[in-house]
Amino acid sequence: FIDMHVHLRDPGFEEKETIETGCRAAAHGGYTTILAMPNTKPVVDNPDVVNYVHNKAKTVGLVNVLQVGAVTKNQEGKELADIEGMVKAGIPAISEDGKSVMNAQLYREAMEKAAKLGIVVLAHCEDKNLVNGGVMNEDEHARELGLKGITNSVEDIIVARDIMLSHDTGAKLHLCHCSTEDSVMMVDLAKQKN
């Protein structure tokens, strides 16, 4: 049983979770393997941080911990992280976790590297430029509550882009948190084409 999206928060945010508490929770839930997201402090964007997590997880020893590497340095979306070095350290995937790389050319380069290195790209599809202060799905309930909504296009646009880049580069793509009808339709169509 594998959980592909956990937050161990170590290093840097141990007040939220530690590798040991996360592994204990996973084992208690019946999981044997977990993939840890890179949103730590420092961000998992180089082999040293990957090795830190893997070594600490081996000491805990309750479940297999596979560390996911960041796509960009410090998850800032400006420059690619040391993807090759992290692959040598054992990452199975890259992700910007919780955000999309908004620079499509940079993301394409990351996908090209991922395809060449045989790792998966885990994508959180959300166009941050369209979120515009929204806090929930834009619908009647949001209006009743007086809250700014987020349209489905925030997700759909990035899903379409990421599927096209995956097709162009040959990268293996896993979309995290798909929530719209059109996103699911695009995934189904992409599966039919490949």
Task: Explain the meaning of each model-derived region.
Residues 47-68, 112-126:
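Alpha-helix-loop-beta-strand connector modules within alpha/beta enzyme cores
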Residues 14, 41-45, 74-75, 99-102, ...:
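Glycine-/small-residue-rich active-site loops that bind phosphorylated ligands and cofactors
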Residues 12, 22, 29-30, 69, ...:
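Glycine-centered flexibility sites
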Residues 39, 56, 60-81, 87-89, ...:
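Hydrophobic alpha-helical hairpins/lids featuring a short glycine-rich hinge
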Residues 4-17, 40, 66-79, 145-153:
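Active-site mouth loops of central-metabolism enzymes
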Residues 1-60:
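Metal-associated gating/positioning segment near the N- to mid-region
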Residues 80-194:
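Histidine/acidic residue-rich metal-binding segments in metalloenzymes
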Residues 2-6, 34-36, 65-69, 94-95, ...:
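Hydrophobic faces of well-ordered beta-strands that scaffold small-molecule active sites
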